[in-house]
């Protein structure tokens, strides 16, 4: 009877955690569909690129959703007084941990497939479609040829990960270093697991670079843009009218030189062509501004202006909360960690930060911690999007044709993709979701940086022996008191989350993340200063001479 009751309790705990995960999965799919449809170009919409973007972003978010499930399951193995629950014997605990680990295996394998095969293939397929009117078969062959390079990179990462030495320095004999070795060896020595962990950690490292560039800047730009608002449509239209008149005068001046029938010099012809292109752009902008000025949406957003200011102030406080927590966590690692050779593992909490204290408290009232982690992930996505929309997607583009004589590189340049609501091309949409996928992968480590104890052990406690001296009695009395689990806890008393072990199997990645966090803080400060110095944004998205994805008939989507 007792065994059956214990098994029933264990099943109930698993059902609760996985039911919440299932509901979150449905919410993620709905969010990704709405988000991608919001940004994709209506004129150049492609079914395959849309599905690819939705699927890849959803897989990354679902992987992040496993983090609170992992923490929930290890936390519910123990009571608040530090004792294990009746059903949480060694076999059941291992079964629960393996369930989460197999979930990570599956999702991370799908992510590798998306990043190194499917997304590049779809991207190159549409690049070939844009360049010439070749047949479908030729487009597929060329796309597969270019995708082969990404497959080779993935294979190299898997091979390096499978055989890279993980041995820690042997000149460390302290108890702490024995604990470090235990943490790195906890997942086992499977070559397949090491290969997958190394590949995902490499992608997470790329996600860290993307977060430093886009998320750190977006965390400062988003709230300040909300507070400052946009320029007046009427004032912008007046300025635009003055620019039109000035350009028309220049055109008339140049044309007047050829009234007597003499041909214009080459220099004047080039100038005339530039002024005519500029005039077309200004007139297109005039139509957009006129539409916006008379739009009911502009008036509605104007009425919501005080609410936007409040949201901007709120987001500034949220950004400061993250920055302070990250700074204190990194400072704690700098002062009290086991050093760079361990990946800056912390033994015990020396400097508390707000989020590290808040999350374990919220976990006692399920599912408040789940909600907070979801909010943190979504906040990172929206701030990343703010950074991407302000900076754009620059990338170095090298294309080659495989010939019998070898590889002939025929195109090498920098290219910028613009991200705008309802105007994003299929290739740009794929790049956008690729960057967001990498940033979301890095979010798991970012949450660990913000709340290291919570991500490692959740709300687990363990017993420690404390010597108590009582008045009126001789000698000391030993008393067992519960203490929050940390890296200094006995190995058999606290269960480490699979998330932590998977992302920290290679100490050198953890060391790189540590230095990346300092760079993140630095870019945030620089971005905050730059955002403060910049003026208000235009009421419409920028209209350029080469703006091929803006039709003359449709107004540009405007920012309010």
Label each region the model flagged:
Residues 2-238, 291-400, 404, 416-560:
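Extended, helix-rich structural scaffolds rather than catalytic motifs
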Residues 42, 262-272, 297-300:
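Short, surface-exposed loop/turn segments at secondary-structure junctions
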Residues 234, 241-244, 248-251, 255, ...:
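Alpha-helical coiled-coil heptad-repeat register
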């Amino acid at each position: 009877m007792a065994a059956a009751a214990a098994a029933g309790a264990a099943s109930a705990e698993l059902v609760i955690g996985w039911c919440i995960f299932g509901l979150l999965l449905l919410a993620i799919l709905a969010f990704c569909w709405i988000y991608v449809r919001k940004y994709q170009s209506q004129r150049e919409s492609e079914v395959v690129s849309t599905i690819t973007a939705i699927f890849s972003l959803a897989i990354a978010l679902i992987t992040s959703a496993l983090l609170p499930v992992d923490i929930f399951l290890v936390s519910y193995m123990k009571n608040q007084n530090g004792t294990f629950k009746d059903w949480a014997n060694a076999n059941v605990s291992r079964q629960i941990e393996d369930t989460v680990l197999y979930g990570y295996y599956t999702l991370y394998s799908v992510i590798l497939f998306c990043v190194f095969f499917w997304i590049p293939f779809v991207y190159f397929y549409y690049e070939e479609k844009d360049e010439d009117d070749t047949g479908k078969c030729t487009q597929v062959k060329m796309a597969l040829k270019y995708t082969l390079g990404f497959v080779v990179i993935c294979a190299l990462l898997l091979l390096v990960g499978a055989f890279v030495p993980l041995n820690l320095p042997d000149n460390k004999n302290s108890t702490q270093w024995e604990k470090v070795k235990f943490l790195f060896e906890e997942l086992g020595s499977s070559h397949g697991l090491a290969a997958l962990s190394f590949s995902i950690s490499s992608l997470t490292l790329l996600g860290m670079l993307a977060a430093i560039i886009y998320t750190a800047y977006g965390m400062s730009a988003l709230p300040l843009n909300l507070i400052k608002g946009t320029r007046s449509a009427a004032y912008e239209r007046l300025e635009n009218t003055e620019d039109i008149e000035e350009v028309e005068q220049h055109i008339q001046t140049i044309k007047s030189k050829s009234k007597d029938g003499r041909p214009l010099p080459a220099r004047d012809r080039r100038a005339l062509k530039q002024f005519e292109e500029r005039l077309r752009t200004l007139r297109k902008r005039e139509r957009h501004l006129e539409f916006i000025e008379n739009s009911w949406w502009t008036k509605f957003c104007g009425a919501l202006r005080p609410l936007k200011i409040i949201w901007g102030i709120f987001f500034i406080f949220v950004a400061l909360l993250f920055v302070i927590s990250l700074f204190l966590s990194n400072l704690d690692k700098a002062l009290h960690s086991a050093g760079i050779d361990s990946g800056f593992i912390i033994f015990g909490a020396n400097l508390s930060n707000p989020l590290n204290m808040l999350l374990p408290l919220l976990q006692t009232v399920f599912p408040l911690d789940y909600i907070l982690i979801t909010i943190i992930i979504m906040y990172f996505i929206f701030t990343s999007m703010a950074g991407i929309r302000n900076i754009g997607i620059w990338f170095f583009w090298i294309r080659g044709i495989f010939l019998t004589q070898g590889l002939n590189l025929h195109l090498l340049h920098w290219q910028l993709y613009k991200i705008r609501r309802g105007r994003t091309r299929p290739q740009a949409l794929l790049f956008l979701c690729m960057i967001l996928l990498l940033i979301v992968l890095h979010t798991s480590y970012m949450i660990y940086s913000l709340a290291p104890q919570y991500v490692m052990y959740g709300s687990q406690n363990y017993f420690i022996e404390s010597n108590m001296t009582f008045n009126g009695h001789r000698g000391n009395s030993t008393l067992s008191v519960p203490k929050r689990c940390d890296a200094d806890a006995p190995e058999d008393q606290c269960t480490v989350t699979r998330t932590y072990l998977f992302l920290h199997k290679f100490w050198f990645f953890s060391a790189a993340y540590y230095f990346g966090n300092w760079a993140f803080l630095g870019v945030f400060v620089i971005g905050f200063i730059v955002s403060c110095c910049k003026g208000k944004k235009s009421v419409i998205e920028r209209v350029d001479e080469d703006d091929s994805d803006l039709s003359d008939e449709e107004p540009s989507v405007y920012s309010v």
